[in-house]
Amino acid sequence: MMRFTKFYAPSLKEAPKDASLPSHIFLTRAGFVEQIGSGLYNFLPLGKRVLDKIKNIVKEEMDKAGAQEVNLSFITPASLWQESGRYNVFGKELLRFKDRKENEFVLGPTHEEAMLSLVKNKITSYKQLPLHLYQIGLKFRDEARPRFGLLRCREFLMKDGYSFHANEEDLGREFELMYKTYSQILQRMGLDFRAVEADSGAIGGSGSKEFMVLAKNGEDDILICENCDYAANIEAAKRAKKTCQDERPEANYASKFHTPNIKTIDSLAQFFKTNAFYTIKAVVKKAIYENESKLVVFFIRGSDDLQEVKAQNACSALELVDASEEELEKAGLVAGFIGFVGLKDIDFYIDFELENEKQMIMGANEKDYHLIGIDVVNLNKDRFKDLIEVKEGDCCVKCGAKLKQSKGIEVGHIFKLGQKYSKAMNANFLDENGKSQPFYMGCYGIGVSRLLAVAIEASHDEKGCIWNKTLAPFVLEIIVSNIKDEKTLEFANKLYEDLTELGLEVLLDDRNERFGVKMNDFELMGFPYALVIGKGLENNEIEFIQREGLVKELIKTDELTEILKKKVL
């Protein structure tokens, strides 16, 4: 019997000082998790029950999709990461260490290399493909600033799966299967989510989709079409090409105008009495690479803003940082007056929406001068990249309807890795013609421990957690208002046994505490339903409480089973 007096759920009156999000506040106060260090958490019985439910749903759906579960070592030899080329690319988030024999290892934040090593030289023929292996295990990412509780911690539980294919077409089939599988997982958990176009980040590859649970405290900005199914992370969002009805500025090609102290787009547009849409903005960044750094200039429409993740991908940098005034001066760049005409010895990229644009205004690479009448033509195609940040109100790239911005929390990510890792690690198989070919790979991750926090970010009130029936540690709590009343306690015990036999997960609050304390704990812990056994029992009545909205009603004891079957089971 699950009695509160025997159940370990140490609650706190106050939230941790660094807790700002509801999930962090309520999960620690209610005794689901306990923080033991920066970004490190213990899962207590309540949290472990939810975690197990999440894991079971993930496992059931992955197994149904034909994936096979394995369990890889938490520690990976550094040589595998060096072989793939990711050892230096991943940055300081990858925790590196040596054993007593000076052998180098890493704590795996992902396991592409380890999983590829597992099948390398064992899967040797196309006849053994496709193969999909997954695990649910610990990961470690040495975050610089762990925060927001389970949403950004250093050690976390993750489901990561990897598929191996003979060709790109079969990889596409598996990608679509995982899209459906992940959607089913999140639907079963009762979460409001969107699958969005995404950047591949340090993992690499193409064909990337993130699964975002909508929540007002979400750390990611996502754009959702009001009409069709298009949705994208702001880092990867695309739009229908913008147009402007205002007249273009008139001038001969590359006419040079004296524009004293005109350094901003607004002042430039005002000076030429035109729309900023017809100006070209230069954004200078210092691109950091493995063994060097250099200045890169990104040219975008004056009415747009640079999307830094897109810009970083365009120049294949590990990181972009702001360039200093000294660095600009050393490179011969004049801040506020930079243009691509005559720009020498500096890498530059142009937003692809500017290709073939006519009669534009741009810096002349000379202090206090701009060029007007610039045609963006006859340039190397490789210069044109998707660089701009798409915003709310822009038009959908698929159907042309308006895009709406929302907040989301990433809980899953699926990638088409292609042959990136298999080529780097020389992992091959023999195709139908007996020719050696690198595997085509897919990668599929779900943040299992993160989902526990996400569920509460998406469903809570000012009093505490609000769990749905699928994820709740207990579906129903029986609250005995006066534990010293033998008749009440006897009825509660019998009710507990009857409901357990019906298959309900029930917690019996038999503590010798004030009724107000018990109710506060119920509201904080957030079980979907409660039955209060109190004075009403004299009239054969019990109070039924629904946690969402704290809806209360009195029900007769002889109607209890039927009502619970309708509302709870």
From Swiss-Prot:
Annotated GO CC locations: cytosol
PROSITE patterns referenced in this protein's UniProt entry, alphabetically: AA_TRNA_LIGASE_II
CDD domains, alphabetized: ProRS-INS (cd04334), ProRS_anticodon_short (cd00861), ProRS_core_prok (cd00779)
Record-listed E.C. numbers: 6.1.1.15
Ligase recorded as keyword: yes
Role description: Catalyzes the attachment of proline to tRNA(Pro) in a two-step reaction: proline is first activated by ATP to form Pro-AMP and then transferred to the acceptor end of tRNA(Pro). As ProRS can inadvertently accommodate and process non-cognate amino acids such as alanine and cysteine, to avoid such errors it has two additional distinct editing activities against alanine. One activity is designated as 'pretransfer' editing and involves the tRNA(Pro)-independent hydrolysis of activated Ala-AMP.
Name of the molecule in the record: Proline--tRNA ligase
Gene name of the record: proS
